[in-house]
């Protein structure tokens, strides 16, 4: 073997000794990428429906609800009344003459009815009526009578 041929062999060996680490890294990256590609095709291959647009195409119209709050007692009774309106906001009326009533109409799917009253006589009552049906009624007979009516879902 001549020196020239032996010199080429040594230079290739020197070249491989310098670039073997980058070559191993390149092979590991290629093999790792292929493994991830294959595993991804097994475990995440189903196409799921997007729920980004959840608007219903057609909503059925419904009749508005009518809610009536009533507070009653002996003639001349004055009461302090608290209630939730159609938007569930608390309202208060001080010194209301009885009988007292309030009619609310709403298109909400559900409404919570809450009515509280305290009068200056020994008897007071309340009633919540939803679409003509009495859903809650209570009468209290005591000194400075206090009563409440509650409908969780009207």
UniProtKB/Swiss-Prot annotation:
The keyword Iron-sulfur does not apply. Gene3D superfamilies: MmpS1-5, C-terminal soluble domain (2.60.40.2880). The chain crosses the membrane at residues 19-39, 97-117. It comes from the Bacteria. It is found in: Cell membrane. Pfam families: Mycobact_memb. One of its GO terms (cellular component) is plasma membrane. InterPro entries: MmpS, MmpS_C. Its main location: membrane. Keywords: Cell membrane, Membrane, Transmembrane, Transmembrane helix. It is a multi-pass membrane protein. The keyword Cell membrane applies. Disulfide bonds: none annotated. Belongs to the MmpS family. This is Probable transport accessory protein MmpS4. It comes from Mycobacterium leprae (strain TN). The lineage of its organism: Bacteria, Bacillati, Actinomycetota, Actinomycetes, Mycobacteriales.
